[in-house]
């Protein structure tokens, strides 16, 4: 998931900064390591939670296909709904919600695929 995020935001970095309303100089201030540490820990927690959800499908149901489907369902029902509410109250642009939301869809689908391949 972390490598996907690096690739994704490298491609969409300019659009993401515009949607965020910040410049590269503004983003480079402060502790640069903290967001990456938080992201890494959060993605580990996310993977464990996703593995638990996939594992609850029952014996013989932990497959790459079911992992992808579970990741997409959890993204639609939890991640995007929460992000949409938070972004609206924060006054964020819809483009930021779409860019960040698509990132998390990619993360959950990839994690679900890998979890489905290796099992829980």
What are these regions, as identified by a protein language model?
Residues 1-120:
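Juxtamembrane/disordered regions of integral membrane proteins
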């Amino acid at each position: 998931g972390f490598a996907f995020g690096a690739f994704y935001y490298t491609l969409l970095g300019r659009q993401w900064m515009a949607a965020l309303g910040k410049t590269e100089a503004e983003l480079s201030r402060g502790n640069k390591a903290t967001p990456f540490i938080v992201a890494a820990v959060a993605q580990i927690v996310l993977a464990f939670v996703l593995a638990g959800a996939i594992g609850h499908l029952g014996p013989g149901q932990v497959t790459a296909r079911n992992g992808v489907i579970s990741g997409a369902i959890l993204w639609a029902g939890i991640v995007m709904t929460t992000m949409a509410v938070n972004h609206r109250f924060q006054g964020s642009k819809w483009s930021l919600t779409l860019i960040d939301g698509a990132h998390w869809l990619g993360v959950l689908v990839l994690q679900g695929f890998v979890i489905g391949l290796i099992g829980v």
